[in-house]
Amino acid sequence: MEIACIILIIGIAGADLAGKRYIEGHFQKNQTKDLAGGKLQLRKVHNKGLAFNQLDAKPDLVKNLSFTGTIAAFLYELWLFRKPGNGMGKLGLALMSGGAVSNTFDRIKRGYVVDYIGFPFKKEKLARITYNIGDFAIFIGAILMCIGNFDKRK
C-alpha cells in the first residue's frame, strides 16, 4: 500500500505541474477555452492566496502555511503507514499530499498557484472559481480520509 501511495503522490503532483506548465506556456492570463461542449473550461488564473484567494495580501504567510501543512501531511502519512489497516485513510492522505506538493511548489517557485479548470455556472460568483488537479485531489482525499476514519471507529 505504501508504494502505491508514493506513486499516487508523485503522479498527482506531476500531472498537476504538467497541466500548470502547459497553461502557463499556452494561455494568456484570464484566457478561457471551452471544452466538453462548453461544460468545462480551461483558463489561466494566478491565485496568490489560499483557497478562494484568502490571505492573498500576505504571500509570505501563505507560503509558510502551505509549506508547514505539506510537511505535516507527510509526517502524518509516515506515522499512518506504520499502522495496519485504514487503506482508505492512507489513500486519502496520499491524494491530499500530491495536491499539496504541487500547490506548495507553485507558491515557492512562482509566488502564486496556477489554477486552470473552471465550470461555466450561470451564477457569476461560482463561474469565476478556478481549480487545478491538486485542488481536486485535496478535496477528494479529505473525503476519503473522513470515510476511512469513520469506518475505523465502527
Model-assigned labels for residue ranges:
Residues 1-154:
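Alpha-helical transmembrane bundles and membrane-interface segments of multipass inner-membrane proteins
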